[in-house]
């Protein structure tokens, strides 16, 4: 009698399906969801977000709510705007923390909120929006992009 080979255990991936108008149907692995214990300013009840990359809008990415997938915020790396940007000493480990700034797009142009960045802890899949106490950064840093009236 021959012994059976040892069972191979493969981890099961937990996947969520999100239906969005902007990006269509998105399949998201749980491990790619960032938990925001305090939500975002003005959206404290929303605690889970993903980052969506869309090659049509690079370098802009989208912070998309898992609970309300119709809600997404345009974000980008602040280092593309200011290479010397610093969200503070608590977040200086660039291997662990990734800051993103929320963009506001209007008919007058586009601005970035450098004063209240999103900081992603990529090791623990956590996120938070912080407020930098210094007056060094603006909530409406101009991007120099004029919004087109045609789409």
Please name every model-derived segment.
Residues 1-151:
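Hydrophobic N-terminal alpha-helices or hydrophobic patches in metabolic proteins across all domains
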């Amino acid at each position: 009698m021959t012994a059976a080979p040892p069972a191979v255990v493969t981890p099961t991936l937990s996947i969520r399906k999100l239906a969005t108008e902007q990006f269509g149907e998105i399949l998201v692995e749980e491990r790619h969801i960032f938990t925001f214990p305090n939500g975002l300013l003005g959206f404290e009840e929303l605690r889970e977000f993903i980052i969506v990359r869309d090659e049509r809008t690079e370098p802009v990415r989208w912070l998309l709510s898992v609970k309300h997938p119709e809600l997404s915020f345009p974000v980008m790396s602040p280092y593309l705007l200011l290479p010397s940007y610093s969200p503070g000493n608590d977040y200086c480990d660039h291997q662990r923390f990734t800051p993103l700034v929320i963009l506001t797009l209007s008919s007058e142009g586009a601005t970035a909120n450098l004063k209240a960045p999103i900081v992603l802890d990529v090791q623990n899949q956590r996120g938070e929006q912080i407020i930098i106490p210094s007056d060094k950064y603006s909530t409406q840093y101009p991007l120099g992009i004029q919004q087109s009236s045609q789409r």
